[in-house]
Amino acid sequence: MSLKNNFVTKFFLAIILIFLDIFSKQLVVRFVELNQFISINFFFDIVYIRNYGISFGLLADLYSAWIFILIGTLITVFIIFIYIQSMDKFEKLGLAFIIIGAISNIIDRIFNGFVIDFISFHYKEFYWPAFNFADIYIS
């Protein structure tokens, strides 16, 4: 595969993953009330949460969308630099997923002022903080 075709393929896959994240969030906004839990089974719920902070809602009290957008963008640019320098294909794959997830969550902050989280796992009364597909990509 030529270098150009390889880039186009990777770029297209990145766009699909970003679209999947954004589309899933918009489905939640359209069909789930804010803070509503929809039980799927004994350990999985769909919930509409607005995350004004960073991971797991941390620093939400210091909320400023533009600060998080700026910091997220700077970190993403730094990770892109590491990606470009890397020669290991598995490291590049992991970094690519982090970059894709970060870009998707930055898009959320730019257009909404917050990140939409909706995937909720729990065991009895212990709930893991809600997250989204972009968070899965980053993890």
What are these regions, as identified by a protein language model?
Residues 1-139:
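Alpha-helical transmembrane bundles and membrane-interface segments of multipass inner-membrane proteins
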